[in-house]
Amino acid sequence: MNKSINNLQDIFLNNARKERIPVTIFLVNGVQLKGIVKGFDSFTVVLDSDGKQQLVYKHAISTVSPAKPILFNSAQVFDN
């Protein structure tokens, strides 16, 4: 893949974090976690839920569903 293309996953999580959009994270075992994304790296997502932090490993995540649409444009996906 071309290095000028940014990681869509990172753009999505970063916008959710910056805009403080509540998300529901569905794990592969069916558990639902709700909260605000506080941070993330290549392997984990930190979720704040009612003042409690949870470190969730990305390999355990099935789906991330935001409470409202996360807007981004092609300029965030492609470097010019």
UniProtKB/Swiss-Prot annotation:
Gene3D superfamilies: 2.30.30.100. Coiled coil: none annotated. One of its GO terms (cellular component) is cytosol. It comes from the Bacteria. Keywords: RNA-binding, Stress response. The keyword Cell wall biogenesis/degradation does not apply. One of its GO terms (molecular function) is RNA binding. Residues 10-70 form the Sm domain. InterPro entries: Hfq, LSM_dom_sf, Sm. One of its GO terms (biological process) is regulation of translation, ncRNA-mediated. NCBIfam families: Hfq, PRK00395.1. Belongs to the Hfq family. RNA chaperone that binds small regulatory RNA (sRNAs) and mRNAs to facilitate mRNA translational regulation in response to envelope stress, environmental stress and changes in metabolite concentrations. Also binds with high specificity to tRNAs. Homohexamer. This is RNA-binding protein Hfq.
